[in-house]
Amino acid sequence: KDKNSKIIIGDKSAVLFQDELLRVKKNKSKEIKISTNTKVVILVVFKPSHLKNISSSNITKIKNIYNVKKPWGYEKWLTGSTNKNYAFKKIFLKKGSKTSLQYHIKKIETNFLFSGNAKLHYMFKKIPLKKKNFLKISKSIKTKIIKNGSVINVNPKTIHRLEAISDLMLFEVSSPHLSDVIRVSDVTNRPDGKIKNEH
């Protein structure tokens, strides 16, 4: 920290509050130091090769996080709505709610369950993925209780759904295919893809 208690980042400083984010541009920073007098949780998303030749002049504070309303809670797109390299989301689900039973054609995602308990509905079995096969699909769905600290990797064509046993907070890192959502079943009958009135 400097004498005014601002966090020093090389030759730059920034004060971060809850839900704020710093972005480090590819191949620019060597070291990030954080000083705090309260407990904080820091999530870092990067490709290993991006840690070479980093300079502090390419660290920026994200001011406008993209917010998306959902019937089950909300998403905060921490990397914005136009990042072509990857997506990083903070996701909140209300207790008792559930996401669509869905799969993706291209999108690959990893979810970190930060707080709360959930029931994961999933299926790896290869069944022709069409909505008219829902009865066949539903008989093959497995469930598993997951708790905070769990990590879920979802590959393309894996049917999945999260059901919130308690309020849930999770972080998702994925490929940038954010409209690639095929909804096999949805409580509110939402169609496939991006829902305009949520944005």
What residues fall within each predicted segment?
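A short, N-terminal "cap"/entry segment at the start of jelly-roll beta-barrel domains
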Residues: A14-Q18, K26-K89, K94, K98-S100, ...
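Short, conserved beta-strand element in jelly-roll/cupin
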Residues: K1-S5, I91-K94, Y103-K126, V173
